[in-house]
């Protein structure tokens, strides 16, 4: 089941059908309000969607062309949405996997911090018992103000050295009144970052992640398939494919259980504040930057996986953010 948020004389929520039509959900203007209602009434999200599905239809292609799609989950107050993520969690392609195993097979003291973290995940990211596994790398991207929907530009501040894509899957969550995290489902995400800054010094990773993040276009309700295979592309301004590469996700291609990544995020009381929204990305092993690609303004990132329907498309833009010097009081 795939859900969409879009504009039509105000915000709307629709269910994507196999014929490409979007059927409106009655009495529903946001997936956030829908989730809060489902949590409060202790219902099943998929069942409520079935009950609310109306005969009113919209054309998905037209919504895409007219850029009327919104991120699939938002909080009405962007300060109450956390956008965060984990890295070094994916095994990647067979070549990447073999390469990684060779790099981490030596003496632990000779490994870089990144390879140590990857090795920890291989050894303890999927515990056999009910105990928590090893904690992953973790980072903060921003609040809800950085979220962008399909068709909206990803804006790189002019002080950045790079604006590159990271094709990922995100978990989408709302915190219940007793602090319980409830997962609505999953969505494609472009965890947009400055890879040159990160490469210059790994301690600048936190800086490099403070960028916008595209999510959508659709929310996949329910479980994530164990194996997700997609394509990440960079299109030139004339729509020519300049670079493309498959990417893999799902637990079969990860060194951590998703439940383990969720545990190590939500174990902090700060992230269990009732009513808050969390968009948490799970990592990737595929980057155009790793192949020497520098994306130029106006070029388009395109991330696609069959389980999520239409691709997530966002053009790169650059702007000078406003800056004011600090004034002492």
Write out the residue ranges for each language-model feature.
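N-terminal basic/disordered segments at the start of proteins
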Residues: 1-18
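Short, exposed beta-strand "edge-strand" segments with a Pro/Gly-rich flavor and a Y/T-containing core
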Residues: 21-31, 54-58, 178, 216-218, ...
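Active-site microenvironments in enzyme catalytic cores
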Residues: 4, 8, 40-236
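Catalytic-pocket segment enriched in acidic/His residues
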Residues: 8-10, 187-189, 193-329
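Helix N-terminus capping/helix-initiation residues
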Residues: 30, 59, 85, 151, ...
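Short, conserved beta-strand segments within well-ordered enzyme catalytic domains
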Residues: 15, 24, 80-82
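Surface loops and adjacent helix of pleckstrin homology
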Residues: 27, 93, 306
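N-terminal cap/recognition module
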Residues: 18-51
């Amino acid at each position: 089941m795939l859900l969409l948020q879009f504009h039509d004389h105000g915000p709307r929520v629709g269910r994507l059908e196999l014929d490409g039509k979007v059927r409106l959900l009655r009495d529903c203007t946001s997936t956030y309000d829908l989730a809060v209602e489902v949590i409060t009434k202790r219902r099943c999200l998929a069942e409520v969607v079935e009950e609310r599905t109306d005969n009113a239809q919209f054309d998905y292609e037209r919504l895409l062309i007219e850029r009327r799609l919104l991120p699939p989950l938002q909080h009405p107050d962007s300060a109450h949405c956390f956008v965060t993520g984990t890295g070094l969690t994916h095994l990647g392609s067979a070549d990447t996997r073999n390469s990684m195993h060779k790099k981490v097979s030596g003496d632990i003291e000779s490994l870089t911090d990144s390879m140590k973290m990857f090795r920890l995940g291989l050894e303890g990211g999927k515990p056999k018992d009910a105990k928590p596994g090893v904690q992953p790398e973790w980072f903060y991207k921003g609040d809800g103000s950085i979220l962008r929907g399909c068709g909206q530009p990803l804006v790189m501040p002019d002080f950045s050295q790079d604006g590159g894509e990271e094709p990922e899957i995100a978990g989408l969550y709302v915190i219940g009144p007793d602090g319980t995290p409830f997962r609505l489902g999953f969505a494609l995400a472009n965890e947009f970052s400055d890879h040159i800054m990160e490469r210059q010094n790994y301690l600048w990773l936190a800086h490099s992640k403070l960028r916008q993040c595209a999510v959508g276009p659709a929310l996949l309700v329910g479980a994530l398939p164990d194996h997700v295979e997609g394509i990440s592309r960079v299109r030139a301004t004339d729509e020519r494919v300049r670079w493309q590469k498959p990417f893999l996700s799902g637990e079969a291609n990860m060194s951590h259980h998703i439940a383990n990544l969720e545990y190590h995020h939500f174990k902090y009381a700060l992230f269990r504040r009732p009513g808050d929204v969390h968009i948490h990305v799970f990592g990737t092993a595929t980057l155009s930057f790793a192949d020497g690609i520098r994306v130029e303004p106006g070029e388009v990132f395109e991330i696609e996986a069959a389980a999520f329907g239409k691709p997530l498309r966002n053009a790169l833009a650059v702007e000078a953010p406003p800056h004011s010097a600090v004034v002492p009081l």
